[in-house]
């Protein structure tokens, strides 16, 4: 349910963009994102930091996009967000010496340090790839291609990255379960 709720503003943006253009799509995205945050707060009693960050960026860049009737502002948002997420992951690992993914999920998952490090680097790499893809598609393809790729391409890539994470973690989770059963 939560993942579907997070996907709704994007689908609304894409639909309105195709039917009515950039300005109306940006306004729809901003309104849908604010409603989404309210619904998340009501249903789950909590809004994650990443959701707040995304919400603030969407509202800020969405308003700029609507005001100037220029899709480039939302294109920049995608690049900045992916770069920011990659930077946070890399700084957590190389400056603070503890992967942020471990800080977020360490209570639920007990994994060796090297697995956390690889997982953190894998997701940092994913965000860097998304950032670079967004730059290329933004500058070398039409706005329609960008909007379609933003809606469906990045969603597909995120799904693939999540599945790859599960496949990578599966053997390590079995090892942790076996260790717990022996104890």
Swiss-Prot record:
The keyword Repeat does not apply. The chain crosses the membrane at residues 19-39, 53-73, 76-96, 121-141, 151-171. Keywords: Cell inner membrane, Cell membrane, Membrane, Transmembrane, Transmembrane helix. It is found in: Cell inner membrane. The keyword Membrane applies. GO terms for cellular component: plasma membrane. It is a multi-pass membrane protein. Its main location: membrane. Pfam families: IspA. It comes from the Bacteria. NCBIfam families: ispZ, PRK00259.1-2. Plays a role in cell envelope biogenesis, maintenance of cell envelope integrity and membrane homeostasis. Belongs to the YciB family. This is Inner membrane-spanning protein YciB. It comes from Actinobacillus pleuropneumoniae serotype 7 (strain AP76). The gene is yciB.
């Amino acid at each position: 349910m939560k993942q579907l709720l997070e996907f709704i503003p994007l689908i609304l943006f894409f639909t309105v963009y195709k039917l009515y253009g950039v300005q109306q799509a940006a306004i729809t995205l901003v309104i849908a994102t604010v409603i989404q945050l309210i619904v998340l707060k009501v249903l789950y009693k909590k809004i994650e930091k990443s959701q707040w960050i995304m919400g603030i960026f969407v509202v800020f860049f969405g308003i700029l996009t609507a005001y100037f009737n220029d899709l480039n502002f939302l294109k920049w948002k995608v690049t900045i967000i992916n770069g920011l997420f990659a930077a946070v992951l890399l700084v957590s690992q190389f400056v603070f010496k503890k992967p942020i993914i471990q800080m977020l999920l360490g209570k639920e998952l007990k994994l060796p340090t090297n697995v956390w490090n690889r997982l953190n680097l894998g997701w940092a790499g994913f965000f860097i790839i998304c950032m670079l893809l967004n730059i290329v598609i933004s500058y070398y393809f039409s706005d329609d291609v960008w909007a379609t790729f933003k809606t469906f391409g990045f969603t597909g890539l995120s799904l693939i990255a999540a599945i790859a994470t599960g496949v990578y973690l599966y053997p390590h989770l079995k090892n942790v379960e076996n260790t717990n059963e022996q104890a």
